Amino acid sequence: MKVLALWQGMGGVEYHRLYTPLKRLQIDHAEEIEVNVSQDFQKAGLPELKQYDLVLFNRDLGENHYEILHYLAKHEIPYIVDIDDYWVLPKFHPVYKYYREHKLKQRIIDAIRYADGVTTTTDFLANEIRQYNQNVQVLPNALDLTDEQWLLEPQQRDVITFGWVGGITHSNDIMLISDAIAQMCDYYGDKVRFVLCGYQPGSMWESILYKFNGCAEKLRSQVVVAPSQNVNEYGNFYRLFDVALAPLENTKWNNCKSELKIIEAAAYGLPVIASEVAPYLSINPGVKFTVNTPEAWFAAMRQMYEQADLKIVGENNQKHTNKIHDLTTINQKRLAFFKQLCK
């Protein structure tokens, strides 16, 4: 089976939903699948698509979106679109205006509607997709734990450290824990630390840092900023702390996301404090769930701080997550789905 994956650039989506699983498929099932990649596909290359049994992409194909879809349909070349996010963006999203101007919502819906199959991350998002296409395969996110970024030694620390890893789309989520961080810093003084991971210069990140800093103008001594890293290196962040924070507003946009932060924390055997909202609702003995109030977040952080067996809680997350998000097992389902569409 000869497969072509199309993507533009290498962001987190491409890395987790296409590059990582397809790399392992090629390594583990070389006798059954040949994976080719194009990161800058042009319409001049349309005739070359005939040599492939299956074409894969995530969400959208760029400026040649409809021409490529039309060519695939005309020549009966099956394709799978992978959907990892809800296609209706909240108005505060940084690319909301761009989505509207370029009609990306409709382009994504059409990609789903005409696809031979759709892959996605969760049952919640799969139910949204089924409005347009019934042939949906849930393939949860999973890490390739043989990658170096998930195998590094933890940083030596002398105080309990909480950390958050994320991007500029999570500004509202960070606000949920702002007061709790301020209370923790006041309560424990220099015996606690918070690490903000992924920082880049710019007004949106400055807003996130302000909130993460407990809305204090001067950077607190307990708050550390770790600059952005590449997608094949950012796993290093999880070496820097003892407890991962996963605050999330209860919105449909967020409900359609995956539990990737819990999966990443599990790679380093870390416990997690997460908002009690989808997609974080699955029972996990290594995750402390909390409602989204400052008092509840402060209480959850204090409870985790005082936890005598913190390492055991983290190991529970690791064991639980490794069973559900095992890349080898998920890739067997992925390969079977590919074969089904190539008959």
Regions inferred by a protein language model and the residue ranges of each:
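Conserved donor-binding/catalytic core segment of Leloir-type glycosyltransferases
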Residues: 4, 154-182, 195
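Nucleotide-sugar-dependent
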Residues: 172, 228-237, 242-264, 274-282
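Membrane-proximal helix-turn-helix segments that form the acceptor-binding/catalytic region
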Residues: 71-74, 99-117
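Acidic anion/phosphate-binding donor-loop and adjacent secondary structure
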Residues: 143-159, 343
